């Protein structure tokens, strides 16, 4: 609330950076607006919606991740923008958002999915000019578990707000079932959690990572509870949840709790030419 001034302006937002990460935190504003009716929150929500309306896009309509990352879609961006856009469309009766959301989800799946592993590469560069981009596919070289987790969480969350009769739901349901099938293949059998680099459990420096594991558990639990995937996945979800508690939750001397083994960042490009 302190970040929104009396006119509804988001104080820290640099609008023209077209940073898609700006959008996700706006989801909390729907609750504020519903409970208070304060017009400041509506102005802020409209600003975030306006950013997405003006966000630079790939030739097939995919949101660029940021202005400084031209022609690039990252799995992260689906989580950062699509659930917000879906909720905005539902609350304010903007039905135009649904086709756009489905296109974002399907487009990045089409560009980043690797049938050999059943996993999604972290990012895709349409221009194929980035140091990290495969010169034939434009994909980044690695499978970063948290990015896949963000994508998985996004595809179950958008369905909360998308009309049941909307034809694009079927394609999202297909993606959800593909994700579930492949995510459980990489669940570490002894601990029930997942590796930082999803498919490289024996690689030196790789480790069991808490944020990705949490997102995968969230995805599996919600997809089972909503009936999107067979109930048989409940066992994997429970094994993952128990693994989170056992592997990553640490009680401190003062009685507080810490979540451990959380990756700080694993981006693409920029300083040091990160490869995700």
Model-identified regions with their sequence ranges:
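Surface-exposed beta-loop-beta
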Residues: 119-145, 152, 156-173
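Oxyanion-binding "anion nests"
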Residues: 152-201
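Long, well-ordered core segments of solenoidal/helical folds
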Residues: 1-12, 43-62, 98-124, 128-131, ...
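Acidic/His metal-coordination segments adjacent to aromatic residues that form catalytic metal sites
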Residues: 4-12, 62-67, 128-141, 195-205, ...
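CBM-like carbohydrate-recognition segments
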Residues: 5-9, 13-20, 24-26, 32-35, ...
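Well-ordered alpha-helical segments within folded domains of soluble proteins
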Residues: 1, 17-34, 74-90, 144-160, ...
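Inter-helical turn/loop segments and adjacent helix faces that build the functional surface
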Residues: 36, 88-99, 158-170, 223-231
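Short, contiguous, pocket-lining structural segments
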Residues: 73-80, 93, 97-100, 135-150, ...
């Amino acid at each position: 609330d302190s970040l929104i001034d009396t006119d509804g302006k988001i104080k820290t937002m640099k609008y023209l950076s077209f940073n898609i990460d700006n959008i996700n935190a706006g989801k909390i504003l729907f609750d504020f607006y519903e409970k208070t009716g304060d017009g400041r929150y509506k102005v802020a929500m409209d600003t975030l919606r306006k950013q997405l309306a003006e966000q630079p896009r790939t030739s097939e309509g995919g949101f660029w991740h940021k202005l400084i990352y031209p022609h690039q879609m990252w799995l992260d961006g689906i989580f950062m923008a699509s659930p917000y856009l879906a909720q905005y469309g539902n609350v304010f009766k903007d039905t135009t958002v649904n086709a756009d959301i489905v296109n974002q989800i399907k487009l990045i799946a089409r560009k980043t999915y690797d049938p050999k592993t059943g996993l999604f590469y972290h990012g895709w560069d349409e221009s194929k000019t980035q140091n990290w981009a495969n010169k034939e596919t434009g994909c980044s070289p690695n499978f970063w578990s948290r990015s896949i987790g963000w994508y998985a969480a996004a595809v179950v969350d958008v369905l909360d707000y998308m009309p049941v009769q909307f034809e694009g739901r079927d394609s999202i349901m297909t993606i959800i079932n593909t994700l579930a099938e492949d995510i459980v293949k990489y669940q570490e059998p002894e601990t029930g959690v997942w590796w930082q680099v999803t498919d490289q459990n024996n690689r030196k420096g790789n480790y069991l990572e808490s944020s990705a594991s949490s997102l995968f558990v969230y995805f599996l639990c919600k997809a089972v509870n909503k009936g999107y995937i067979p109930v048989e996945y409940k066992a994997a979800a429970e094994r993952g949840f128990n693994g989170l508690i056992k592997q990553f939750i640490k009680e401190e001397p003062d009685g507080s709790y810490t979540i451990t083994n959380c990756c700080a960042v694993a981006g693409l490009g920029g300083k040091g030419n990160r490869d995700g």
